[in-house]
């Protein structure tokens, strides 16, 4: 088993390498990879149906949040 992920349709197969039968460490690595790839967030969003209007509103709010964060970081870099 490789350490990367392979794309299958829309989902990515997340794989971790178990070394020296250290399952706890492998689980920790798996959880970290899944967190990074947004699997838990996706599961939470898909738990209930989201109306298209709600989805648009959520995505717009996320875009605004991202833009504000980028602006804040840009100003911080420039020393304001």
UniProtKB/Swiss-Prot annotation:
InterPro entries: Ribosomal_bS21, Ribosomal_bS21_CS, Ribosomal_bS21_sf. Keywords: Ribonucleoprotein, Ribosomal protein. GO terms for biological process: translation. GO terms for molecular function: structural constituent of ribosome. It comes from the Bacteria. Pfam families: Ribosomal_S21. GO terms for cellular component: ribonucleoprotein complex; ribosome. Belongs to the bacterial ribosomal protein bS21 family. HAMAP family: Ribosomal_bS21. This is Small ribosomal subunit protein bS21. It comes from Rhodospirillum rubrum (strain ATCC 11170 / ATH 1.1.1 / DSM 467 / LMG 4362 / NCIMB 8255 / S1).
């Amino acid at each position: 088993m490789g350490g990367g992920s392979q794309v299958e349709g829309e989902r990515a197969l997340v794989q971790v390498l178990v070394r020296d039968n250290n399952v706890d460490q492998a689980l920790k690595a798996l959880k970290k990879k899944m967190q990074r790839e947004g699997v838990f967030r996706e599961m939470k969003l898909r738990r209930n149906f989201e109306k298209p209007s709600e989805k648009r509103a959520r995505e717009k709010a996320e875009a605004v949040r991202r833009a504000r964060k980028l602006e804040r970081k840009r100003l911080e870099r420039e020393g304001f």
